[in-house]
Amino acid sequence: MRRSPIIAPLSVANANPADVYISPVNLTANGRAHLGHAAGPFLRMDVVQRHLKRAGHHVRSGLTTDGFENHVLVRAARENIDPSDLAHGFHVEIAHDLASLGIVFDHFDDPAYGKNLQRFSNVSNALMEALSAAGSLEFRAARLPVDDAGSALTPTEERFCIGGWFGGTCPVCGASAGSFFCEQCGDHFEPDEARNPVSRRGRIVEWTDNISAFLTITRNDQLVRAWDDAAIEPGFVEIGRRYIARKGQRMRLTVPGLHGVAWNSQQFNTRQILFSYSSLLYAHSLYCGHKDAEASGTPSAFARNSDTFLIGATGIDNTIPMLVGVTGCALGQESFRQFDRIFFNHFLLLNGSKFSTSRGHVIWAGEIAQVPDISIDILRVCLSEICPEEAETDLNPKQLIDRYNAILDKIAVVFNRCTDIINAMPSSAACHVDDAMMLTLNRLYNQQCSALSLDHLRVSHVSRSVTEWLDCVDSNPHYQNAYTWLMGFSILGWPLMPRITEALWHWLGHEGHPIAACAARPSSVRSGRIPRIDGRSLTAADIDGCLPGKVAP
């Protein structure tokens, strides 16, 4: 396992900053980003990104949306709209939803749109050619269902009932499932392996052989060893092992279709496009690396000879796509490399059940961020605490409101008291940090860094250091203690609360974002307006106003 970037002690400069690139799994562009998305891999990676930057590392990031995923076609057909237009419209809304929560990436592209498509096709085909050259492709016939939704004029590729059109029972856990995967247990399967197969747009009338490209890794246990190298947690490794025991180190790389990135071979009996949950999924990351390389003038972080530390993240429903599809594609050729760490999370529920757009059982990230006078920073803290890292967690609106208001009230009192004290200092007074408080800050910083370890990430524990720091100053502190507390709050709070901590950091006379190495470096300069936390309490009416419909009980 590759060693994680070193985190220097508090107040010590990073002598060996690492290059880090973060590329979470894309979002399907068939809808907006809700709090279930945001509180999972995206807030998680935003916090990690800020933590590493705070420690002095060079961090870049990229994200995409998938406009070719089959569920885009399903929604486009239902709404009678061009799939590309629908996908790009949701791409724009997703960008707004995530940015509303302070979740931003250096590059956030729609690779299927406009001029991006040529770059995307180039990197996708380069991957497939590399896999072919390495002997990692197998062409074989798979039985696929055909339904009666089309007509005699319907192209062969569009008559297959696959992806969002296909439903059935998971062959592994028996849960209701669809497409090629089961959200309940995380497993993937071929349509002819599903029990009780049905078409969601008509009736299955026959099964026919279709030749597609499949990934095959021949070296024994190569995938399992790669998972160990990437510090995959045991529960997700078990999902991967179960898949390999059932299907071997193989996975589908192409599907029949007309809307997608095509790859041609004389072996095929229909037009084939790259599969969104293996080859195309990896191609999204390669696209991000290519885009970053163009901007930075350096080789792609995914190039085989790059020493950039690569981090990926996704939810449990993408366990097999990442562990077998993406990791397998990385191992199966010599041009591109695998992730150094992949972080998985479980589902975040809403009032005990999954987020559902159709039932109005959803809170859009961009909607809650528009609640008047809401503190996005406090909301991020609340969401981080219920990040589903070890099991499913539940976003209960009443509990969210209570927790939000409790954190807001406590932080506002201490924060505003300390900024008022510093603001009232004589201009001739020098600023110093308190040694005893710095010892406490050092302990809490180490505690937070442990929670943010890339070997065992627990974003849900990160706020503990911040809340404990709130109790480290009395009700009428000396200005030296108030100053130390504010410096510490900037350092500890930045990964979770970037808006208020950056404003505080700048007001305290520092540039850029909070840096751990500068924790004990005071400045007598005050820049701009005094920062304050004046947000109002969150109410049930605020939450109700964010919903397409009443939250399901």
What is the predicted role of each segment?
Residues E389-E390, I422-P426, Q448-D455, C472-P477:
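Secondary-structure edge/capping motif, primarily at the C-terminal ends of alpha-helices
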Residues D85-D106:
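A glycine-rich helix N-cap at a beta->alpha junction
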Residues I411-V414, C418-I421, M437-Q448, V459-V473, ...:
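Amphipathic alpha-helices that form helix-helix packing interfaces
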Residues H107-S121, R140-P155, R341-F344:
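Short, glycine/charge-rich beta-strand/loop segments that flank catalytic centers
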Residues M1-P17, A142-P145, T156-E157, W165-G186, ...:
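Basic, alpha-helical terminal appendages of large translation-related enzymes
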Residues R2-L43, R50, G62, F181, ...:
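Structured secondary-structure scaffolds
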Residues G135-A213:
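Cys/His-rich short segments
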Residues R2-F90, D109-A134, R143, A313-I320:
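N-terminal catalytic cores of NTP/NDP-binding nucleotidyl/phosphoryl-transfer enzymes
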